[in-house]
Amino acid sequence: RNYRKLGGILKNVLDTVQRLYAMGFWLEIVTLVIPGFNDSDEELRDIAQFLARISPDIPWHVTAFHQDYKMTDPDNTSIATLLRAAEIGKSEGLNFVYAGNLPSRVGNWENTYCPGCSAVLVERHGYRIDSCRIRDGRCPDCGRAIPGIWTRPDLPADPPSN
């Protein structure tokens, strides 16, 4: 609703998300939650429902706004608001919802869980991966396929520098 105020055309963004998914591209959607701008339950629910209609397996990252650079009038996004956004995403049927950019302050919303058995698959702290249990794109506990782009476990996490 407020996207137009920023000079964007929301329909173009939504159409592009649908088109890219239909073409087989891997998508992860990030929503910067800005107090008083796009943090209402209705707006967050609309985003989550839109994504879930395309695929419940599209990861949705809700991130906190910080008063930086030129946009300094709204308050920073509170932890409670970010957690509410994540809960809305989960309640609307999204399998992979993350609350980001507030490391150690969003509980388990940094981690990836199996939608089949709820096992912890990827443990994170901020942008650091502490452990990844996904093997061959599957949950090691129940065998459910976990959508994403996964590397083989025998490859180094960081490529050697030249």
Region roles according to the model:
Residues 114-117, 139-142:
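Short cysteine-rich clusters marking metal-coordination/redox-active sites
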Residues 120, 145:
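Cys/His-rich metal-chelating microdomains
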Residues 1-80:
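Conserved AdoMet/S-adenosylmethionine-binding subsite of the radical SAM
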Residues 79-89:
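Short alpha-helix
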Residues 99-105:
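Acidic carboxylate-rich catalytic motifs and surrounding loops in phosphoryl-/glycosyl-chemistry enzymes
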Residues 123-124, 148-149:
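Short, non-ligating residues that shape and space the ligands of small metal-coordination modules
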Residues 128-140, 154-162:
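Short cysteine/histidine-rich metal-coordination sites, predominantly Zn2+-binding motifs
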Residues 109-111, 136:
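Residues immediately within or flanking Cys/His clusters that coordinate Zn2+
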